[in-house]
Amino acid sequence: MIGYAVLGGFVLDAIFGDPAWLPHPVVYMGKAISVLEKGLRARLPKTPEGELWGGRILALCLPVGTFALTSLVCMGAAALHPLLGLAVQMFWCGQALAAKGLVQESMNVYRELIKPDLPAARTAVSRIVGRDTQALTAEGVTKAAVETVAENASDGVIAPLLYMLLGGAPLALTYKAINTMDSMVGYKNTQYLYFGRAAAKLDDIANFLPSRIAALLWVAAAALTGNDARSAWRIWRRDRRNHASPNSAQTESACAGALNVQLAGPAYYFGEYYKKPTIGDAVRPIEPEDIRRADRMMYVESLLALALGLLMRGIL
């Protein structure tokens, strides 16, 4: 049943994406994280050790609770009727994927860039990146959008797809809980240096294998879409560690190589300047059309991952 749920979820995401009117599990995960963080901080000592333990408790409770709750709902639905169980799994699998939403948001940036309306492009890209965007040039906006497509191809598409192929919607949503937790508390700043450490480490572990699979699939997608697959492979091998996270540069490096552009580098986050290494070679200047090229490669690698997964499941 899992294979059919994954296939159905993939189709649902490709057609509908994430409609704004439809409640999304990630929203409730975010609310749960905020409540748990507030409660843990209030009850534990305000010391590095106390914050470490608070973060560990959060990193245990949220994924375990997510898996338990979603498993109970799926089993309950299947007990009422197998088709209802399949429908619930299919619906949640679709919500765990973010391919359509990623393309929609990145294309919003693309459309503003080609008008050209730089202030509107900055606003559009600010919805999908964490860096400060107020002073970005058109090149900086384009680079930010391409980087986001490449990175989220892993943690927004390939990783949840892999986990749902292994354990259905419950495991995919558990992964989303880990990823959401990291995005909310996994910062190395004063507020979360200790409290967010366990969440960040758990996210690194959960993404370790998927990010590398995603990078290899990106190289294959580069070949299938007429981009530079040889350069994608070479730059991935060279620059895949050019990031503080062991996973974030995996698909970014493959994407930079495929497009023959340079990504990453210094950026401002929350008003603070961060000096980060570059990824890829500036063989040519980056251009708005690279956003569309990245989107196409992301979709092709998603289809490759789906096909391989369904073959392993015996569906194809």
Each model region followed by its residue ranges:
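Glycine-rich phosphate/dinucleotide-binding loop and adjoining beta-alpha-beta core of small-molecule
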Residues: 183
